[in-house]
Regions:
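Bacterial N-terminal signal peptides that target proteins for export
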Residues: 1-11
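Short, intrinsically disordered low-complexity segments
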Residues: 4-5, 16, 29
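Bacterial N-terminal signal peptides
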Residues: 11-19
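Sec/Tat signal peptide C-region and signal peptidase I cleavage site
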Residues: 22-26
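Beta-strand-enriched cores of mature, soluble protein domains
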Residues: 27-138
Length: 138
């Protein structure tokens, strides 16, 4: 009888820990940084495309394109497509060189991906910087 109660207690503990594991990992915010350059491209909706030159997030490596799809006032819709996934977001510009971009959800490897970054540029706007945090989950 005691061994059955002990087994049930152990199983209950395991189930409780398994239920809490996704919650713990979902809330884990991590630092994010990338550098990108942008070039004119008449085939793109807004006439330019940006390419990641360096990233400390392995799923958005150097060479990844960031596309800007539409704009409404100071808000520009953006899309990042990687091998086996994508995510969409919005960048709100406060000046020609300052913005905040927010991405959420996604597909494939970027399912439940969330990203919030501050966008800045170097003096001649040849390199753009994204600095902020990312996490997976709701």
């Amino acid at each position: 009888m005691h061994s059955i109660k002990r087994s049930l207690a152990v199983m209950g503990t395991i189930v409780a820990l398994m239920a809490l594991a996704p919650v713990a990992s979902a809330g884990s915010h991590r630092a994010f940084h990338l550098d990108k350059t942008c070039a004119e491209d008449g085939s793109e909706p807004l006439g330019y495309i940006c390419t990641v030159q360096h990233s400390d997030f392995k799923w958005i490596p150097a060479g990844t394109d960031i596309r800007y799809l539409s704009e409404d006032g100071n808000v520009v819709q953006a899309s990042i497509e990687i091998r086996n996934g994508s995510t969409d977001g919005a960048c709100t510009w406060s000046s020609d060189v300052d913005a905040i971009c927010v991405f959420s959800a996604g597909t494939g490897r970027l399912t439940q991906f969330n990203l919030e970054v501050v966008v800045t540029a170097n003096a001649d706007q040849s390199v753009w910087y994204w600095d902020g945090t990312y996490w997976f989950g709701d």
